[in-house]
């Protein structure tokens, strides 16, 4: 297997931190044992956990106002896979990559699959794109795609999704994620009902072509790029879609796609209860679909989402098998650093949720002891589980401190020298 | 039939406005005719339209900080019915009253029904109350009602709903509206899934006892009185309830119960499309469940909701038969004046939606002519339909200018003399 | 003066609508007279009113996901001025254009000024751009501009603003509008206090170079492009800036730059009261800085803003002289049509505010007659003032129905033939 | 000094936890030492820190829908002081109580002061109440108080504030907190400018009577009890007030009084920078002014607020001396437990902010290393500082685990037996 970061750098980095980590792990183990928790069992679960990385995440993102690229931007999916391999090597938490078509389209799928294998990466859910026009495309998506009033445009969008499935089959993917920007900017522009009927008809055509062992994930979003109405605007509509399509259809929850103040963990619980939670696009946000680094704004909210997931896992909820993926826009950081940190944040929330005293919690809930129920969650959240995460990484040949190891490796400077600088772009779209 | 306002006052008031109204109606008819619209047909529809008044709406509302009562507060449901009769006499748009149990509980239901008949009022949906404790109640709803962890408390809440149905049957009502405040104030306080399972079980027990010709309306609300999670928090959960319960179960939409920025008219469209729109609690809001007078904050939003309703009515959407009710808190106005004005605002939105050029709109939607689609709605909304509403009222023996007629009648001073002043209350709940 | 639309087309269009307009104007005059309002006086004020058009508004806008250009996109500021001239010719409500530097930078300012004169357009406030990197720029604005931690970058941003002033002086502009995207995406990324100190220092350098008869407008915005904190995030900070800078500094209010639910008309009132209202960027929004067409989402809110403006105008508030400009992103419409319609919407809100019965309103406010105060505003808002606007346009040689006249003229097809199609862009910025 | 909880109970509770605490404190000290932090120095600061408790907080709160009292509700301010003394005895973090007039009005101020002394409690800021009508009050606050259109009503509100100052002087308080509910429920109901002028005039009269060594805190709030506009709606208006009044006037920040998504820590920074931060009402919220327990919903936000406070403290910001108070509504918990837990949460955020590596942070900020700046804060936040807080309590004769000690003491059952049960109330205010 090709390793992007030299093991000598990594070993030296780990060596400098190993003793302190051992002490911290022991001390934490002692404290957890007092609470009846076996630290090694938690570590084993954390070590087995992974979150997929989006191929587009390793490039610098931007806004409609501007994009400010960083050095060494990946030029194509092969470069992107190498960056993803760095993330996986150091964190040991991101074994799969999620592709975006047509951005990651290649002529030789076999070469792509081989590259992934060589880097130890598999291919997660495929993502279609009918929210922008590819060069030379016959019909524009300016006024919609799967819900467009014109049947030829809808057909084109359906075909594109089918092509994504075909590519995914070649790469070993088992799921298709469909997010559309379809909607309207003016009251009256679109007939809500007819648009949704058209969307459902199109999705049924896609669904019909889905292999038996695949799942299809639909993703809701409140607004942007449409600013008055969006066809798949919330989890209610998303649930209706999954219900209309059938047993292979599930709802994808992106943490930044909801109205202000919405209780997202409750939506997660409802979708689990009705067997339609497909998975997540993890990120964080303060205002809208900010696509900030996971856990950087409201880490307790992330924990509360994982509290629902571990609750479902613990009681072996029927049909519970969500896919986990990061989906962020890295506008001001090195994308590799952001994705490593975010993957660790997801793992941290998982670890914290694992050490919730669920028996005590259930008792407090039954007795309506609101304060102690809250404290039970807070106690788990307050626990600094970093020694667990770091030990899991170390034992899996990753880094105790991935960002430090990455910086020590000089990887960014190396690829900056190899990959030519790209223009900024975005500045004329206001 | 007993008339609360003397016809001589009403006639005098109308006489002073009749000529101007005739001219305005003619001039508007001329303008509408140019757009291919028959003003008399619109007037006929408006004249036939009614919205129910909530019995509690004729008392002065308040907040957790204070309640500032006005003069002549109704002392009981009989007083309330008289106030409601004033509203109906002058607006001719509020033929039914919606009761709230136990607030409107009486020992003699026959007398109550008779009083309604004498005043020309029928009884709309019954409203149960399991969000506050009635004196002497065996089990408290402090920690929930239909979803409470304790089965005896749930049973009590179920029985209360069944009692509401019994009362409603005696009065000629055909629907039960269920809104619960159940939820939690702390993460962890409640297990979302188990609480919803308990809620559904309780509601199934209520549903099972529903007469064949009744409907049951469940009402979602984002927050308040619970401030972290609410069991029936949004239309997605509300839809699941209606689906789980069966064909007599429908979703009620209160305009003030959504997250900030949410597109409510789209939710209305979805519920119509999936045959689960039960009806409305009309009001307006700027921040939360402000319960302000309908149309006082965002009249265009109200129009857009009615645009969906008329769209469904026009295409005779399957299963479309929503109930219309006002639900407001009148903290700084004479409740009778607010309810009259709000009933007229609802009628206004309906009239404006009726004169939308739907054929042109459909064409613009098909061609993605967003600007002209928007202008088609705006043109209807901009039309001052007051002459239509006023003429419909006049021809139905109501008032051209209900507030002016009401003030001229001296009704408030009269009841202030008859009904003793009540204390303010509310001041200690912070 | 060069006319972009042939007068024969315009005359024919107007001829077909003139009789109906005359009747409608008379009928409206009759109704207004009954309320003690002289329709001709209102018309005169409306006719004298103008709103500036942003040069960038005549191009198609987009989002970070995609931009879908329309036919005949303007290639440069000369093309843009021609499009602006169409808007002014037909609406007679947009006599000035606001430029954006460097987007509208030219080598020959004299030619630009002459072109404006020939088209009957003057130059409104200059807009600087330090939120994106121009090709070849020495220092990047990736991490801020006027508040950047690096003094050379701040100096560059200051110089750019000074250059904008110089260009504006040559063109007859009298104001500089400064909006920066400076902020942060992570808690901790920026020290709020130091960043604001640096911003103020930079702005003081710009202010020092401002000609005596110029004003400087600073614009606040809650978020985007920065997603955790923004240096000039709200009107409170904006007020502090204007206060720190001095008497030529004022606050600019963009209707889409506030937190959800915020009462914008109240902010307008506060800024007027404290003599710091500089002007407006008009648009509409439902979720964030959606930059939708003015009045398309919440026309009553627009009216309430104008209600404050007319209130201040009526009482001749000290220091009250706001600048009016549209600032919208036209993603799915012909930008010329959107700007014409929006200019008319602004005029409509002004006309509606002019016919508010201010004496009655003051009385109701004094007596706390909330309902009648509200009805006083609603009565004005409900009045269809289109005949006033259309007559004002007609008498100023504009179009009774600008969009219809524009479509009849074939202008878009003509420029589409002359101006080569442009690429979409935007698709890689997610 | 009177101790409400017997020392034998407390000692037994502490004894059972002391060994584990010693180990945890040592282990944490070891980890902090590695980061260059002296745990004892942090502990000393935490031990010296206190937050005031609101007298009304020890009673059960409610909503406009209902209030569900708990057992042993305090009957008067003497009972309330005893409950507050429990909180202080166990947490050693709440040495002062903030009174609310007229709720806490007594005939014998000397007795009240003595009772406080006996319990080891001092008196923090006085709170006036002009948002509800006291029995027998001459003028109603239904339509406002300090901003009312009627001068006699304003005068009454001024006098009430002056009385609060007089009471406070007798008790040793040094500050007056003014929060008014003044505002409007309808567009047009209130003239924003005139209402604010009247408010300022009234406040100037209050300010004029303020003793030299007192401060006056004004508190802004977006909405509730007024639902369209609020006179002191945000920090911008609050700043204007403090500026207009003079050097003894400061702004109070309640964490739940802002628009959705607003960056509160930034407002705190601005007020510090402009020397007008008066202090805090701590609580937490998810939707509006939910008045939930501090740190229960978004603990990271609380930490970010304290990060600003410690930043200001570290650089000895000019004029920086904020008052700290809890302000919560305990609807579903034992108020004593909630207040103890919340006081500890405030201390926790303070301790976490104290261990931020500020030198490293400043370096990352200077270099725009957004990721490491964020990680620097997250590292401090992730540290479980409970051993520091618990040791500080223990060394101050408080409880290692205050809630457990309180439950063991049987205090609630004791007062429930002494204090008669109270009615629920609130149920009629909808």
Curated annotation (Swiss-Prot), chains A, B, C, D:
Where are the bilayer-spanning segments? none
Q: Which cysteine-cysteine pairs are annotated as disulfide bonds in the entry?
A: none
Its keywords, alphabetically, are:
Isomerase, Manganese, Metal-binding
Read off the InterPro entries from this record.
L-rhamnose_isomerase (IPR050337), L_rhamnose_iso (IPR013451), Xyl_isomerase-like_sf (IPR036237), Xyl_isomerase-like_TIM-brl (IPR013022)
Per the entry, which co-factors are needed? Mn(2+)
Q: Which Gene3D superfamilies match?
A: Divalent-metal-dependent TIM barrel enzymes
Tell me the residue numbers annotated for binding Mn(2+): 257, 289, 291
Q: What is its EC number?
A: 5.3.1.-
Gene Ontology MF terms:
isomerase activity; metal ion binding
- Source species, domain of life: Bacteria
Keyword DNA-binding appears in the UniProt entry: no
Q: Which NCBIfam families match?
A: L_rham_iso_rhiz
The record's comment on protein family reads: Belongs to the rhamnose isomerase family.
Protein's name according to its UniProt entry = Probable sugar isomerase R00627
Q: Which organism is the protein's source?
A: Rhizobium meliloti (strain 1021) (Ensifer meliloti)
């Amino acid at each position: 297997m090709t390793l992007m970061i030299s093991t000598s750098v990594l070993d030296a980095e780990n060596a400098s931190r190993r003793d302190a980590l051992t002490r911290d792990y022991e001390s934490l183990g002692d404290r957890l044992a007092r609470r009846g928790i076996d630290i090694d069992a938690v570590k084993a679960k954390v070590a087995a956990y992974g979150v997929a990385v989006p191929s587009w995440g390793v490039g610098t993102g931007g806004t409609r106002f501007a994009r400010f690229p960083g050095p060494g931007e990946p030029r194509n999916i092969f470069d992107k896979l190498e960056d993803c391999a760095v993330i996986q090597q150091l964190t040991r938490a991101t074994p799969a990559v999620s592709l975006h078509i047509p951005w990651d389209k290649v002529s030789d799928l076999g070469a792509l699959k081989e590259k992934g294998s060589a880097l130890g990466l598999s291919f997660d859910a495929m993502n279609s794109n009918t929210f922008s026009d590819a060069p030379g495309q016959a019909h524009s998506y300016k006024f919609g795609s799967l819900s467009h009033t014109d049947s030829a445009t809808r057909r084109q969008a359906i075909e594109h999704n089918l092509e994504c499935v075909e590519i995914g089959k070649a790469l070993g993917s088992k799921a298709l994620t469909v997010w559309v920007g379809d909607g309207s900017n003016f009251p009256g522009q679109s007939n809500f009902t007819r648009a949704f009927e058209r969307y459902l008809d199109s999705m049924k055509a896609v669904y019909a072509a889905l292999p038996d062992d695949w799942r299809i994930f639909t993703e809701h979003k409140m607004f942007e790029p449409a600013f008055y109405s969006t066809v798949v605007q919330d989890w209610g509509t998303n649930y209706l879609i999954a219900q209309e399509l059938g047993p292979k259809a599930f709802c994808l929850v992106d943490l930044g796609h909801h109205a202000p103040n919405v209780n997202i963990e409750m939506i997660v619980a409802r979708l689990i209860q009705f067997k339609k939670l497909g998975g997540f696009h993890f990120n964080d946000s303060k205002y809208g679909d900010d696509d900030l680094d996971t856990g950087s704004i409201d880490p307790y909210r992330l924990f509360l989402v994982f509290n629902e997931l571990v609750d479902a896992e613990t009681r072996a909820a029927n049909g519970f098998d969500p896919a986990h993926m990061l989906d962020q826009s890295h506008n001001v950081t090195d994308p590799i650093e952001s994705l490593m940190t975010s993957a660790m944040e997801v793992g941290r929330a998982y670890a914290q949720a694992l050490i919730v005293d669920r028996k005590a919690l259930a008792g407090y809930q039954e007795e309506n002891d609101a304060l102690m129920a809250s404290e039970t969650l807070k106690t788990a959240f307050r626990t600094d589980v970093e020694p667990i995460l770091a030990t899991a990484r170390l034992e899996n040949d990753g880094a105790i401190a991935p960002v430090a190891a990455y910086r020590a490796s000089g990887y960014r400077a190396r690829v900056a020298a190899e990959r030519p600088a790209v223009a900024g772009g975005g500045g004329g779209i206001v």
